[in-house]
Amino acid sequence: MNIKRKLQISSIFLLIGILTFGQSKDAEIKSFLDSLQPSNFSGAILVAHNDKIIENKAFGLASIEYGIENKLDTKFNIASITKMITAVATLQLFENGKIGLNVPVGEYLPNYPNKLVRDLVTIHQLLTHTSGNNNFYVGNYLQSDKMKYKTISDFVPMFANDTLLSKPGTKYNYSASGFVILGLIIEKVSGQNYYDYLKENIFRPAGMINTTELEIDSVLQNKASGYTTFFGESDIPKRNEYYLSKASPAGFHYSTVEDLFKFSKALRNGKLLKKSTAELMFGPKVKGYSTNLGYGIDIDLRYNQTIQGHSGGWYGVRAELMDFMKDNYTIVILSNIDDNGKTGASGVADFFKELIAGKRNKD
């Protein structure tokens, strides 16, 4: 047998092995999803392989009070996954020469009330949570009147004059406040309302027709209410509307599993950013609490392949968007109940990480 023939046969067996391995994973995924019980997980899960949806299932109730079931097109609160969208908007403006990554905030917001932020904090630091700004969602926000947040500027008084937690550029501190500042800059340099900018430059090009910032006093069809037992006197979940406001650049948009898959696909395939800009976004910049961070995106290097995306959590909200960069899987998990561990949204995410990305490496 000649060398060429041997290589052909070897290639065939390698291809068969790869296909069998992929089919085995897909079968395990189906079996796992079939085993999930609405009593433990409420939400929707989408699995795509090579940018083709292979599983898309909904579980549990969108409204406990009215017995309305979650569906494939149910809109869930995505919490901090909004930050990833804000980062893309920022990098689009960088791409167009309207924003510099190492330029201080004051260049774009000369009247921003905090002088240290104006003079010392850069766009790079805002995108990587190294600006020293705090996380307003765990401060005065909880007790505030959520109805008053109509514009990006409405969020600013909660944190603008707070003391920085660290010298800008020296330490990682997860900061919702920093992403609100990015939202202000997006408005200033684009000349558009933040929400309109997203619709025109991200949602429309990506085909995300079911993603919205949601005015609190408006009615949204197919919306899942979130349910939480935090701050309660019993184990009976209560609706979480008290803890939610209109979306800010740091969190709380509503979306569907399919829309977030479309967002992931558009981002990876050059519809939203040039290849060089996407690579800049995806490159690890700093070490976070457990993963590395690019620009507004988590880069998990703890497994046998890179997992990138973002998670989100709040009272009665859990969201995961994960792209497995070697094996080309995309997983979207949206849940409208508190995370309950093994079969909650984070437990479901762990299942996919172990199955697709292999053995966990040391942190």
Regions found by a protein language model. Give the residues of each.
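A short acidic/small-residue loop/turn micro-motif
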Residues: 60-64, 244, 338-340
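Short, glycine/proline-biased beta-turn/loop segments that scaffold the active-site neighborhood
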Residues: 101-116
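Short, conserved catalytic-motif segment at the N-terminal edge
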Residues: 25-76, 98-100, 160
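Bacterial Sec-dependent N-terminal signal peptides
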Residues: 1-28
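Short, gly/Ser/Thr-rich active-site loops of penicillin-recognizing serine hydrolases
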Residues: 24, 306, 337-363
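Active-site SXXK
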Residues: 45, 51, 75-102, 179-187, ...
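Short, surface-exposed loop or secondary-structure junction motifs
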Residues: 116-315
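Short, well-ordered beta-strand elements
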Residues: 310, 318-337
